Regions:
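Conserved S-adenosyl-L-methionine
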Residues: 57-145
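Proteins with a high burden of low-complexity, intrinsically disordered sequence enriched in S/T/G/P/A and R
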Residues: 1-12, 28, 107, 116, ...
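Aromatic-enriched hydrophobic runs in primary sequence
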Residues: 32-41, 49, 53, 87, ...
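S-adenosylmethionine
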Residues: 118-121, 125, 129-204
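Class I S-adenosyl-L-methionine
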Residues: 1-97
Length: 204
C-alpha cells in the first residue's frame, strides 16, 4: 500500500463520514455535491481565480436541465459535459433522466476524481475522461463508473486503458505522436511581427 496503516484507517473514517453525509442530505435533496462545495470553499481562499475554476451553482444546474428538458423522458442516450468540474451538471441531469450513459471530461485530475466519486454514489453509469476536450487525442487518464451496476446492482469503478479510449472514439494510434509534436511545435513557435513594425526605415 502507498499509505501507512494509520493513514488508511483515517481514509476509511473519511469514507464512512462521506457516506453518512450523503445518506442524510439525499433524504431531502435529489442530489448533493459535497466534494464540489468543499473544493470551491477551499479554492476561494486563494487559487480559484488564478486557475479559472468556477463551478456552476447547484440551482443553476437544476434550472439548465429544466429549461432544456421535455415532457418525454430520454433513455439510452450518451450525455456529455466537456468541462465537468465536479460533475454536478450531469448529476442534475441524471436524477431527472435515468437510464442514460454519462460522459464527463475535464483537464483537471482533481475534478475528474470528484466526478468519479459523485457518479459512483449517485448510481450514474458512464465514464470520466481526463484530457483537454479540445484535443481529444491527448488522453491522460480515464475511468468507467458503475459498468456492471444495471446487471449486478454493485457500484464499481474500473480504470480505462488508452486503447479502450481510442477504440471507442475511432482515434487511430498511428501518427498520433507526430501530430502532437507538430501541434506543440506550432504552439512554441515565436510570433512573427509584420514588416511595417520591424522596419527601421524612417520617413523623411
Amino acid at each position: 500500500w502507498k499509505y501507512k496503516r494509520q493513514q488508511n484507517r483515517f481514509f476509511m473514517e473519511l469514507l464512512a463520514g462521506w457516506i453518512q453525509l450523503m445518506q442524510r442530505e439525499l433524504q431531502t435533496r435529489e442530489w448533493f455535491d459535497a466534494f464540489g462545495d468543499l473544493f470551491m470553499a477551499l479554492s476561494s481562499r486563494g487559487g480559484q481565480q488564478a486557475h479559472g475554476q468556477f463551478f456552476t451553482p447547484v440551482h443553476i444546474c437544476d434550472l439548465m436541465v429544466q429549461c432544456t428538458g421535455t415532457d418525454e423522458k430520454t433513455t439510452g442516450k450518451r450525455m456529455n459535459d466537456p468541462t465537468c468540474g465536479s460533475g454536478r451538471l450531469l448529476l442534475a441531469y441524471h436524477v431527472r433522466n435515468l437510464g442514460n450513459y454519462l460522459v464527463a471530461e475535464d483537464i483537471s485530475r482533481t475534478c475528474c476524481l470528484m466526478t468519479v466519486c459523485n457518479m459512483l454514489i449517485h448510481g450514474c453509469v458512464g465514464e470520466v475522461i481526463q484530457h483537454d476536450s479540445l484535443l481529444p487525442e491527448d488522453f491522460k487518464d480515464g475511468w468507467f463508473v458503475n459498468p456492471v451496476l444495471t446487471t449486478t446492482g454493485i457500484p464499481t469503478i474500473r480504470k480505462m486503458s488508452e486503447d479502450e479510449y481510442r477504440t471507442s472514439r475511432n482515434i487511430p494510434l498511428s501518427g498520433l505522436k507526430q501530430r502532437m509534436a507538430q501541434f506543440q511545435k506550432r504552439k512554441d513557435a515565436p510570433v512573427s511581427r509584420p514588416a511595417c513594425l520591424t522596419s527601421k526605415k524612417t520617413i523623411s
